[in-house]
Amino acid sequence: MTSRRQSHEPPDVIARRGWRYHHLGIPTNIPRADETYLARFGLYVSGFSTSPYGIEWMRFEESSPLHPLIKSLPHVAFEVDDLDSALIGQEVISPPGSPSDGVRAAMIVVDGAPVELISFRTAGG
């Protein structure tokens, strides 16, 4: 029998796996003044660097190659120490890739919702 999490307890991925909240990605169709265009994803992103809560707005081109769940539902992103290990046993909808220097990220689906896992390479690693 699986035990249920109490209202005062953090989710399992935080409490037992050590995943750390990174950001919340929210799809939108409204252009924003501070957008950055990521051509290979057909995606405009904004808000991440200025939001005190880590909210990232994502506006997709119709031709975006990303998975439909990523384009239609908000996602939570967690920083993980070992991306490859974190992906074991997960349903991957966007395989590991490097959206920018020093960053590896992948998207999984959990209970029908997209979840992003991110790892960062440090100056010595």
Where are these regions (language model features)?
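Mid-chain, well-packed structural core segment of small domains
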Residues: 69-97
